[in-house]
Amino acid sequence: MIPEGKNHGLIFVLDWSGSMSSVMLDTMKQLFNLIWFCRKVSIPFDVFAFTNEYNYMTWDENDKPVYPEPHYEKKDATLVVNDHFSMMNILTSNFNNRVLEKQMKSLHRIAFGFTKYVEYSVPNRMGLSGTPLNEALISLHNIIPAFKKQYSLEKVQCIVLTDGEAAPCNRHSEVTYPNGEVHLGTQR
């Protein structure tokens, strides 16, 4: 047993998809209870929300679309990760109490907006999207070791707050055209 739980850390992964709209407020309240517990017993935590919306589209100073950079090298037999996928780090134990409270109030307001279908209350690029749960779980292979190292932790637990099934994951597949050209496509 580790004294006082000082060598433990928690990562929360929140489903930021459209199907969560009716339960987002209750889910957010439960998340806040978990965060207050972590704060009280000094357990470091990070909260990520997975989405395809945040990184969806930006525009440059000339109002031309800027497409997101791919997250990885696309090659045969690798899983397809949507170019718009993002893990938004929305809360962290690094925040002081004032900043944490302000962020939690903002997230509560956004979640309330989802339940009442008041989309105008949702900040730009914070709307709900599809369900890139598989991509989120894959990204944890980088997030968890970095979190563990940052806080010199022995144990890191991950809690996923979701309402269910992930969007399907495709894989890259090389396709040879009749003229001999090889192209990279996708396949389920």
Question: Where on the chain are the PLM-derived regions?
Answer:
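Acidic, glycine-rich A-domain
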Residues: M1-R188
